[in-house]
């Protein structure tokens, strides 16, 4: 069966695009819906669709998109965002597998992928004895660092994503971020905190 995978908002990095390239090489069809200019920065062109409508238009849009593209799987970061909640509800009604990612329960160096959600929605057991039983017979994890990250690069990507999404909001007039505070205030507050640490 052909896997048609829809990528919604993910980490503010090229990570989702790299996953899609790998899955495409294995024969999957990968799609993306960009909700803001920051999304477009990390994935444009091939099989990407720009949603420029309002939040009120999103449920009907995503419902039609899932059916039109015969989506079999959805990959997204954080299931509590407005756009993601509606996509998940419609996916569950259609038997579409939803995989949620976040920055990992074990930090640094790990990223977590879970079916059906994370945290309170996680299917991962909470009892230590069940976790230990699941781990029996598994090899020791390879803790060798395979990828090197850069704080400066992460800051650059984050600022580029949020500031350009703010400045170029006119290109995606209906977009509403899940962030509680405007990025300018977040960056100013973070900068002041870092200065105080010196």
Where are these regions (language model features)?
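Active-site and donor-binding regions of nucleotide-sugar-utilizing enzymes
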Residues: 15, 35-131
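Active-site-proximal region of nucleotide-activated glycan assembly enzymes
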Residues: 97-197
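Short, flexible coil/linker elements and helix-boundary hinge sites characteristic
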Residues: 27, 70-73, 172
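N-terminal subdomain of nucleotide-sugar transferases
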Residues: 1-36
């Amino acid at each position: 069966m052909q896997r048609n995978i829809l990528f919604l908002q993910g980490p503010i990095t090229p990570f989702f695009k790299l996953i899609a390239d790998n899955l495409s090489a294995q024969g999957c069809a990968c799609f993306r819906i960009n909700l803001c200019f920051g999304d477009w920065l990390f994935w444009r062109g091939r099989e990407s669709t720009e949603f420029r409508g309002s939040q009120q238009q999103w449920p009907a849009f995503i419902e039609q998109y899932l059916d039109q593209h015969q989506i079999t799987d959805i990959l997204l970061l954080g299931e509590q965002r407005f756009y993601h909640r509606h996509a998940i509800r419609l996916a569950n009604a259609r038997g579409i597998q939803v995989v949620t990612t976040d920055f990992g329960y074990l930090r640094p160096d790990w990223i977590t992928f879970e079916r059906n959600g994370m945290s309170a929605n996680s299917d991962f057991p909470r009892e230590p004895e069940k976790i230990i039983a699941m781990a029996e017979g598994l090899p020791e994890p390879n803790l060798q660092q395979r990828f090197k990250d850069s704080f400066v690069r992460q800051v650059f990507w984050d600022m580029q994503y949020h500031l350009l999404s703010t400045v170029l909001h006119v290109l995606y007039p209906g977009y509403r971020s899940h962030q509680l505070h405007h990025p300018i205030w977040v960056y100013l507050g973070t900068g002041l905190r870092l200065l105080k640490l010196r």
